[in-house]
Amino acid sequence: MEAKETARIAKVCEKNGADGILVGGSLMLKNNFEENLALIKQNVNIPVIIFPGIFNFVSPHADALLLLSVITSRNPQMLIGEHVRAAPLIKHYNLETIGTAYMVVESGNSTSVQFMSDSTPIPRKKYDIAVAHALAGQYLGMRILYMDA
């Protein structure tokens, strides 16, 4: 998406009561990431928070970064590997991190995050498995649980 369009949408979100703007995703391209963040930051008065797909989506233009651990993945890169790679940049920018347990739940369709993170979604009707994952995230000190279906 073009940076100006992104900034316009962020303004609309703020006007309609959003508490913050998440920027990122599983397949976001790096080529206009910094420009998008800077423009959004200039155009809204609510927190701009990075929702990183991989380690290099770290920027001083954001207010914070969701430090995502895909707790439904058994891929060590998604559990800790990307965090280790991002840590020096996070420290350099003195960026606030928000520990986030990312849980993929079965939706009936394969999703980008499921594919990119090598994650096995939690079956929709297996509440005990979802609760166990959520508790594990809590006990690991995660501040937020983000569920994606």
Model feature map: region roles:
Residues 1-149:
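Alpha/beta enzyme core
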